[in-house]
Amino acid sequence: MDRPLTYMDGETLMNTVLPPIRFVISQLLPQGLHVLAGAPKVGKSWLALWLCLQTAKGEPVWTFPTAGGAVLYLCLEDSYARIQRRLLDVTDEAPENLFFATMSEKLRSGLEQQIERFLSTHQDTVLVVIDTLQRIRAGSNDANPYASDYRDLGILKELADKHQIAILLIHHLRKMNDDDPMNMISGTTGISGATDTNFVLRKDKRSANTATLYCTGRDIEYRELSLEFDGIDRIWKLREDSVEPVSYTHLRAHETGRN
């Protein structure tokens, strides 16, 4: 295809009024493609469910405001019965703009079209969560795993950018420890390279109910959030933020009731 290169000179770019990046969760989750990775049974799905719930309600995620809007959560390793139990654990009232699906097609086999149809019906959608990434990937005979990872995530990245939404992929970590948590994301660097933001949820100790959420991305400031899992409310509560101090008032709000 003989298509000319589209370009812009620096002066024009500097003087062009461009729309700001849209944040679904202020300072944490902008529009684009993102990965939330953690070890099995670490509590990724509990965190993802709560993020979906808060976003759909337009209520804060810890100290971070949300844009509010419709949310689609593809819970591809769960049943509706399990999702119902979890919802009853974390909230007294689920919003009508939070949608769940337990089955979908795979990438390049109809998933993109399924999401497109959902977005056309629910035009106020701001967030799509896919739990897990591996469930939507078909087997590949590609001799270059990096290229395969980058190509697959590129499809979702293009979809997110086209509709100015956030797509959050729930993923796993390697079993081997690393000083840099981002290096523990399973797969090649094609995964972390294709995404706009990467989150790693890592327990402080295997038996502990505390963990650190490492956050890094193109459009956010690097931060580490110290979290504690509340076994009664079934949500991850914020203890410390490496960037901004957490107020006593905020901590008390978490201790005395549900968000």
PLM regions and their residue ranges:
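Short alpha-helical segments that sit at the start of domains
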Residues: 239-251
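Pre-Walker A (Motif I) flank of P-loop NTPase domains
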Residues: 31-34, 69
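Walker A/P-loop NTP-binding motif
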Residues: 53-60
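Phosphate-binding/switch region of NTP-binding enzymes
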Residues: 35-37, 41, 45-46, 74, ...
